[in-house]
Amino acid sequence: MPTSLKDTVKLHNGVEMPWFGLGVFKVENGNEATESVKAAIKNGYRSIDTAAIYKNEEGVGIGIKESGVAREELFITSKVWNEDQGYETTLAAFEKSLERLQLDYLDLYLIHWPGKDKYKDTWRALEKLYKDGKIRAIGVSNFQVHHLEELLKDAEIKPMVNQVEFHPRLTQKELRDYCKGQGIQLEAWSPLMQGQLLDNEVLTQIAEKHNKSVAQVILRWDLQHGVVTIPKSIKEHRIIENADIFDFELSQEDMDKIDALNKDERVGPNPDELLF
């Protein structure tokens, strides 16, 4: 169980990935992205998660550069967008992401959505980039069990990470169990369900008991389920608060109560319906 912001989980290829990071979905490019990245790194974060489609890789890259922390101490993730899927187009998209971020390599590169039929060619491109030493770990995002099963039929390298929507209303038990069995690390996007759970009565009671915020309880629940989590915030006080989750532990009863909130409810698209 992680006990500090710098604690890492070992991926199946031996690379260490921080349990906790900053997500920058819907963070504006330029100053907003730069300042939130700098604030996170200043306050001990070492993992930053962006994507081509977020259109803020430049701002993130400047934040990394201006943070004063050595590149090798950071864990930077980006993702290939749907329209760039395919072998050659993915290779080109990766180079563009690197250029925007002003980096020589990525720690993790993900296929953003499975879509219909291009993800195997896209995966071959990720395997090549990984073998060429341009990425330290490769993975997928929003893949359901059947997508992973299909991918693994032909994959030479198994994904190290699957980043999916995960929160108390979407606990993804089947997918969690499958990934655990395959040695694929699950990672949560939108862990706070875009703020929709902050007034939930069950969560409020648990938070009061531990003298924590609802957000802190949810993020702690992620970690106790063995799920890497990357909450988004642009406010420094919130960036600090989100990460203040290493000094308490949820009981099994707390965990069960939170698990029971599941309704298989999404704030993002259903991966089986987002076809391109």
Swiss-Prot record:
Amino-acid positions noted as binding NADP(+) in the UniProt annotation, renumbered to this chain: 190-242
Enzyme class name: oxidoreductase
Pfam families tied to this protein: Aldo_ket_red (PF00248)
Keyword NADP: yes
Catalytic reaction equation(s): (S)-lactaldehyde + NADP(+) = methylglyoxal + NADPH + H(+)
Active-site residues per Swiss-Prot or TrEMBL entry: Y54
Transmembrane segment boundaries: none
E.C. no: 1.1.1.-, 1.1.1.283
Gene3D superfamilies: NADP-dependent oxidoreductase domain
Binding positions for substrate per the UniProt entry: H112
Record keywords: NADP, Oxidoreductase
PANTHER family xrefs: 2,5-DIKETO-D-GLUCONIC ACID REDUCTASE, NADP-DEPENDENT OXIDOREDUCTASE DOMAIN-CONTAINING PROTEIN
Function: Reduces glyoxal and methylglyoxal (2-oxopropanal). Is not involved in the vitamin B6 biosynthesis.
Stated family: Belongs to the aldo/keto reductase family.
Protein name in UniProt: Glyoxal reductase
Lineage of origin: Bacteria, Bacillati, Bacillota, Bacilli, Bacillales
Gene that encodes the chain: yvgN
